[in-house]
A protein has these predicted regions:
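Toprim catalytic domain recognition across nucleic-acid enzymes
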Residues: 1-395
């Protein structure tokens, strides 16, 4: 029985071992996604023919041969052509493109030219509004003409700016003049719009997304996270780690109540799900999105003797799993436009209507920290504004 790691590389390694040993006997394959006693017994009860995995073996073999040929030949070529002082320039299918991404990013950072600018803000009813200074039609036409001329001259066109048409304050004197222009003038609300939205639960983890999350939250390296999740797998509390899908197969759904029941440390969140039919979303359960293994989830075994680092990673996995059975988070986005002396101002706020799955994480925000940083906006609950209202403001 081939009991190798249930994956492409595990299949390849075991085939090589059997070939070297000269094995000629019939072979069955044990294929499991967790090391719990229940999963192992089920796997042995459903042993599969080795021939079912012939394409997987051939895929692994092709990968190994391709990496060997590329590494052997390209490393020699680049070492002889560009190596200095007996330096070896290693070339690889994955490492070289990854290095290129890092180099390109570093060049972008080095070539970035910061530009100083100012923002005009005002506070009305304890809410901060930011000025929206728009470019004139003549300025927009002139920019478009310059862009066309640059393209005609063979220059690389500029990236489309997210705030195209907005005129930033790049001159301090202009900013002070605008501030003086609105001095002592009242603020008038010109428009109020409210839009309700829904946010689905976060997807389950594959290996890459887990590594990214652990790096953001705990500053763990990709290798550290891999070692931790491998340890959790060997301790039978998490499923197979080296996966590239965020979905579960349909046959996992009947097992989910038992897995949730086993998460005793999270009873506060699993209790509302007990005794009810669990949600079965296509964003979670989809056979067409599952190949060798499903997403990383808890096995239902109670975790014991975990290190602090292991407990942190397990907590991420457990909470993600519980959250997919909770309803969507419902929120409302409110945008308020105002005006002071013909200068337009804007404020945006979001409010949680029904937290849904977000109660699992204890985070009322409907926007990730990364989104906040990218958009440069803070989420805040706005007071009730009425179109046409007017009043004093500061400064």
């Amino acid at each position: 029985i081939n009991c190798g790691d249930a994956g492409q590389e595990g299949e390849l390694i075991q085939r090589w071992v059997m070939q070297k040993a000269g094995a000629r006997c019939p072979v069955k394959r044990l294929w499991i996604s967790s090391l719990t006693e229940e999963a192992i017994r089920e796997g042995f009860a459903k042993l599969r023919d080795a021939s079912d995995f012939q394409p997987l073996y051939e895929a692994g073999l092709s990968r190994a041969i391709g990496d060997w040929l590329l590494g052997m030949n390209a490393t020699r070529l680049y070492t002889m052509k560009y190596g200095q002082n007996r330096q070896v320039l290693s070339i690889g299918r994955v490492q070289t493109p990854t290095l290129a991404l890092i180099v390109n990013r570093q060049l972008e950072i080095q070539n970035f030219v910061p530009k100083q600018y100012w923002e005009l803000k005002t506070v009305y009813r304890d809410t901060t509004f930011s000025a929206i200074l728009r470019k004139s039609e003549e300025e927009l036409v002139l920019e478009a003409e310059k862009q066309k001329e640059a393209i005609a001259a063979g220059k690389k066109p500029k990236k489309e700016e997210e705030n195209r048409g907005i005129d930033p304050i790049t001159d301090r004197e202009r900013g002070l003049a605008l501030l003086d222009q609105i001095k002592n003038s009242p603020f008038t609300v010109t428009d109020v719009t409210k839009k309700e939205g829904r946010e689905a639960p976060l997807r389950l983890f594959d290996l890459t997304s887990l590594q990214v999350e652990c790096n953001k939250k705990f500053a763990y390296s990709a290798d550290e996270t891999l070692k931790i999740i491998q340890s959790l797998y060997e301790k039978k509390v998490a499923t197979y780690p080296r996966v590239d899908t965020t979905y579960l197969s349909d046959d996992i759904y009947p097992k989910c109540p038992g897995i949730l029941k086993g998460l005793r440390d999270y009873e506060t969140f699993t209790a509302p799900l007990t005794g009810t039919a669990l949600l079965k979303s296509k964003k979670v359960f989809d056979n067409s999105k599952v190949t060798d293994h499903h997403a990383i989830i808890p096995t239902g075994q109670h975790p014991q003797n975990l290190t602090d680092m292991e407990r942190r990673v397990f907590d991420l996995i457990a909470r993600r799993f519980i959250a997919v059975f909770y309803p969507d988070c419902k929120f409302a986005t409110t945008t308020v436009l105002g005006e002071v002396e013909s200068i337009e101002f804007k404020a945006t706020g979001k409010q949680i209507l029904e937290p849904g799955w977000r109660v699992i994480f204890g985070t009322p925000s409907v926007q990730s920290q990364e989104e906040k940083e990218e958009k440069g906006e803070e989420e805040n609950v706005l007071p009730a504004f009425v179109k046409g209202e007017s009043g004093p403001r500061v400064p």
